């Protein structure tokens, strides 16, 4: 009986020593004040803020950050030289928010962005170069069909721009030049019939615009010069319709801010 008590006391002592040694190895800095080894930082309420490893003040290996509700905020896996990191970032509810790669703390290559309200719903996929969008950008509906595609050059919208209905039919087709809508601007009903067609010149309506009925017949013809219609007698409803369409064109929400895409 006494032997059991002595043995238990010995094991407890060993465990306490190990814990003390482990704690003493945390949050170390070298003579130059640089973080080295295993670091755990906590919020004022003692909840862990981050848990990771440093070498010469730079993060290496797995590095985890947490929200104050203890949910994982991000997991970054750093290269040995700390220049590259594979990132998985999470919403505060635990759903995945985005995935991609950093090089020198800048987004690089393909990045994916996910919904805050539907777990795993991929909203957007974009290509980055030195933290700027370059190449094709795709937005998706919850069933993974494409909602929109357009291209970027150094974070500026350039080239063809297409939006789709959930059934795959084209909703809108136009193009950008230096981040402004430029050239033909066509919109279709979900049944595939033309809804309106017109022309933009540097984000301003220009030339002949036609509005169609759902059966494809022409409802109105309007002539624009520098964004001003010559047809001042047209019904106010149709004028407001075009104004609203212009206001909302391309307003699929920023995938980094919301999990909803406008149909």
Which residues fall in each region the model found?
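Glycine/tyrosine- and acidic-biased, solvent-exposed loop/turn segments at the edges of beta-strands
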Residues: 19-263
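Bacterial Sec-dependent N-terminal signal peptides
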Residues: 1-26
